[in-house]
Amino acid sequence: LGAVEASRPIPWKTEEPLWVSQWPLSSEKLEAVTRLVQEQERLGHLEPSTSPWNTPIFVIKKKSGKWRLLHDLRAINNQMHLFGPVQRGLPLLSALPQDWKLIIIDIKDCFFSIPLYPRDRPRFAFTIPSLNHMEPDKRFQWKVLPQGMANSPTICQLYVQEALEPIRKQFTSLIVIHYMDDILICHKELDVLQKAFPMLVAELKQWGLEIASEKVQIADTGLFLGSKITPKNIVPQKIEIRKDHLQTLNDFQKLLGDINWLRPFLKIPSADLKPLFDLLEGEPHISSPRKFTPAAHRALQMVEEALQEAQITTNSPAKIIDWYPDAVAQPRSRIKAAVTHFGRDPDSLIVPYTAAQVQTLAATSSDWAVLVTSFSGQIDNHFPKHPILQFALNQAIVFPQVTAKDPLPDGTVVYTDGSKTGLGAYVVKDRVISKQYNETSPQVVECLIVLEVLEAFPGPLNIVSDSSYVVNAVNLLEIAGIIRSSSRVANIFQKIQAALLNRRFPVFITHVRAHSGLPGPMSLGNDLADKATKLVATALSTHAQAAKEFHKRFHVTAETLRRRFALSRKEAREIVTQCQNCCEFLPTPHMGINPRGIRPLQMWQMDVTHIPSFGRLQYVHVSVDTCSGVMFATPLTGEKASYVIQHCLEAWSAWGKPRIKTDNGPAYTSQKFRQFCRQMDVTHLTGLPYNPQGQGIVERAHRTLKSYLIKQKGSIEDVLPSVPRVAVSMALFTLNFLNCDAQGHTAADRHSLEPDRPKEMVKWKDVLTDLWKGPDPILIRSRGAVCVFPQEEENPLWIPERLTRRAPSQLQNKKDGGQVGDEDSPTRDDGSYDGRVTVGHHVYLPPTDASDAECPGVPIFHK
């Protein structure tokens, strides 16, 4: 094998030997095991063993008739510390330079070419049972990385990386991409590649790694990691649209809606897709049958070919690349993000079999054998200890089947829509019925109109809606259990649920893309419902229509529309964002988009994250102050309301009693927690059910806390015990009391320190009325602007610095020697601004990862 000295030891949790007995094997399987083990021993992969460790083996027959040896290493995996990920995603192949030459190789039997650390080999021993105990059992242990060992992929990646390191150092201009056992080398000059390739083969051979000669690709085009690399582009190997499920009008409507949405990107003229669109014509019922015509098949093949040719171009060396600091690049993350894929198995698998039955199944069934060796988690047969689950185990429960999964051929077809003006409408057989509601959310209005339809049509029913929110909610409500009154839509959901459960006939609800421009009865019905809400909405909202016309002419800001036409901020902003001329100039959303408090304790976000390595204390409850950035976390044994209350009491006793915002988890919406908040006089807010609002700040806090737990692991074990509570306390101490921002303040400083001066009062000029107003207090100063809180307004306003003047009483204090602020105030005597930033009240964006910690939070100012 060679390179044994470079093999990597595995960290173990215990030195206690583990023995899992080998189960009996049939004569046929025993013969196959003996033959396979002899072959592996001859190749140097196995050696005889007298180890006190043992785990079972078995064999499965492949489709080709050959046998495959499997080793059940789940028990051994539980005894080892898992290595962290060393390569968390696939390399981005479009980063390869254009027109460079390639050599692609594949390492043959990579795992079996890498030696196992000698001291670790006894742990991977197994037994070949003798028939009828006629002789001592033969025992062997692996000398190479075994299949199924949890750390084998990581050790393989690190081992191959070390083997490639001399080539990387010797040929610095050579691009070397390595992923598991696949290697790609790339260079502009073919001569350099031809010189590097034999040295690469020789270096790999010194490490005991052999390349598969039949898989070597030497050209400017090749297949690598599921993609085809050409001199100019990266293309997928094969794309085909699934067609076997396309049978009804509803099926084709969904497919063609997506194709029509993608058509401009694929640069396909709509005339070329007319045979496909013609399939939507005819019988109007959504369950009416549809079949492909030869012309439609050709049109769909055109779409598949266009998808196949939708290539990613490789990197041109002559192209100028703009580099941005991390904080600046965040708004461009959608555009400049790398293609990265992550995956994670569940921690446990619940099956209706005992441990002995699972072992029997693994010994007799090939499918079970593959499962138990490939699944790294725990296989159990105990459901969580929950009263509802225990009741379901003891009592036969039949879930209602009112909401159908397929269109109902004999059902009435109804199209629904709702608008923000409170107007809802539904269309049945070209007849439009409208109804006005006292709501401003389109989703809520559409929920109400769907409820109206459910009550008006008791027979078989097909509902078509352009709101994914409503479609998903209706499909979930039938088996959602008890809905607690945690928001203003809970009552509507309760009524929809009751209407579904009381129905004798089934109902089918489906989604259709709005404003698709496609032909056919489904698009026509949706357009009729949509126009019904818009026509009446125009008559009901003359102010909004006038504002649209005014903006269409002058393209003024949303704030101007709000003041001039007495609109809400939401209405004014929608007019601006829907303008085709203005949309490309709108500011990009940034990291501070989540609602934040403008002072400590004004808004906390709270959530639960899971850290499996903590064992029973894996449920870590986290709270973060959205103003100061102070974080508090409590590792507990559950996430019920009682644990949430325990976390709240500990957090509030340390940092004060806040207003809190959470998601709609069962613990947060429970009667027990609501009663607790009332008793403690704490305001608790949640988002809409089935439509959770952003909890981005606390989600980033989860990531930050976990990163510090990883970074600080082992740093305090020589002083303090390595237990979850100590680890969490150490991380919180660092985040709250050590990490500083640009002003030298920690999160604890920002949370506890109050301004040592009174609010500065200024008079300010309203540009619309040309009148001076105030004096009013300043909350925040920024470069060229101040945030003023008018006493007669509901919210603060941003005013240009040049349109403000210090209040007369404060000017007099200034002349008399009194200090309105301090000697470093950035405002001159004439009311102008000297360019420095001072703080009336800062709202900080706390550091969330390593990059933020190097350049900690800048102030985020909110209106």
UniProtKB/Swiss-Prot annotation:
Its EC number is 2.7.7.49, 2.7.7.7, 3.1.26.4. The record marks A546, A547 as: Cleavage. Mg(2+) 1 binds at D106, D181, D182. A zinc finger (Integrase-type) spans 542-583. The RT polymerase active site binds 2 magnesium ions. Mg(2+) 2 binds at D417, E446, D466, D530. It comes from Hamster intracisternal a-particle H18. Residues 41-229 form the Reverse transcriptase domain. CDD domains: RNase_HI_RT_Bel (cd09273), RT_Rtv (cd01645). One of its GO terms (biological process) is viral genome integration into host DNA. It catalyses: DNA(n) + a 2'-deoxyribonucleoside 5'-triphosphate = DNA(n+1) + diphosphate; Endonucleolytic cleavage to 5'-phosphomonoester. Residues 408-538 form the RNase H type-1 domain. This is Intracisternal A-particle Pol-related polyprotein. Keywords: DNA integration, DNA recombination, DNA-binding, Endonuclease, Hydrolase, Magnesium, Metal-binding, Multifunctional enzyme, Nuclease, Nucleotidyltransferase, RNA-directed DNA polymerase, Transferase, Transposable element, Viral genome integration, Virus entry into host cell, Zinc, Zinc-finger. Residues 800-840 are annotated as: Disordered. Mg(2+) 3 binds at D607, D663. The gene is pol. Reverse transcriptase/ribonuclease HThe reverse transcriptase is an error-prone enzyme that lacks a proof-reading function. High mutations rate is a direct consequence of this characteristic. RT also displays frequent template switching leading to high recombination rate. Recombination mostly occurs between homologous regions of the two copackaged RNA genomes. If these two RNA molecules derive from different viral strains, reverse transcription will give rise to highly recombinated proviral DNAs. Readthrough of three terminators may occur: TAA between codons ATT for Ile-660 and AAA for Lys-661, TAG between codons TCC for Ser-832 and TAT for Tyr-833, and TAG between codons CCC for Pro-859 and ATT for Ile-860. Its cofactor is Mg(2+). Belongs to the retroviral Pol polyprotein family. One of its GO terms (molecular function) is RNA-directed DNA polymerase activity. Zn(2+) binds at H551, H555, C579, C582.
